Amino acid sequence: MKVPYGLNAGKVFCFHRARLEYVISRRTLLALPFAAACTRPQESFRGYAFIANQEGGALAAVDLGVLAVARHIPLDGAPSQVIAAAQHPLVYALTPETGSVHEIQIDTLRLSRKLGVASQAITMELSADERSLYVLAREPRALISVALDSFKVDWKLPLPDEPVGLAVSPDGRTAAVSSARAVHLVDLPARRLSAPLGQGEYGPIQFHAEGKTLLAGNRGERLLSVYSVAAQRLITHLPISVRPDQFCLSRDRGQLFVTGAGMDAVVVVYPYDTPQVGDTVLAGHAPGAMDVSKDLLFVASPQSGDVSILSIATRKVIAIVPVGSDPGFIRVTPDDQYALILNRKSGDVAILSVPAITKNKNRYKTAALLTVIPVGSRPVSAAVRAV
């Protein structure tokens, strides 16, 4: 196949399935028990994956040491997001329709505290020191700070528009809030909202370069906008070939991967120094959720029920793995042992072995998919925590 040129977003690479290093077919699902027994690492990851079951109204705690559900933790509401603290044995779940935050103890796998912060919420982020939890609320339109020691609302900052996305800088001093009309910075110590950095239909936002720059996806104009945080001004607009719906940074933060409507591709952006679009790599069908290991990029294709795996170094697709029905979220464990794929329609989590993909030593090409674990109704978010 010829390689098309001339796209605004840079080079486009096309790959035939026959040219992939390996493609795992759906019939490998029948071989999962054998494959898992032969390929599971001798030392399993010691920890849990906490999975938010949106329609089940619960968190499923999956013991990653034995690859089985340890407990279902019922919640009052439909969870959409779960975050694990690194410094404390705690996990936080958000139920947007009730505007509530739920705290779960990792050692007991039980709900410990619950706090209603708004009538409706959208998303949440932990502060770097894990002393505060910031909740972005739809009703009322506000950024809300929760003090985690007392588990009470510390302050609320009203917002001019219905918010969409939230990001918190690594130093914990600045937040960014996007909306369908603009993107703003928030001085967290002063509890002050900046003037709009830019006008447009913004979606995902991400701090970069130790919080010195802000990357903002303008979905209305298919732009990646880069702003200076200190100067509160635009650095550049980068036209891209997809609507910027999802962001994912490489571990070294040297590459930003973008997926969204408009093209079956992943756009690769180099955000350091002079930000520029690098490559546009064809991958999957209507690609969506992403996550990375040190060397690999995992990209979910909800419509086709598979995950495309790319080498970050070469930006080539090296595998396509069928995982289930409607994969919509990916989380790689901190030790790069497992990639967890949440399948919303089939209500399960597919566990991929990252070393099996990286080393490519399995002659039958079935080692990557270790097992599929039923976890509940419509799993949509996961957080992994070592113990």
Positions of PLM-derived features:
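Secretory targeting signals
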Residues: M1-I24
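Predominantly soluble domains enriched in secretory-pathway, periplasmic, or organellar proteins
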Residues: F13-F15, V23-I24, L29-V387
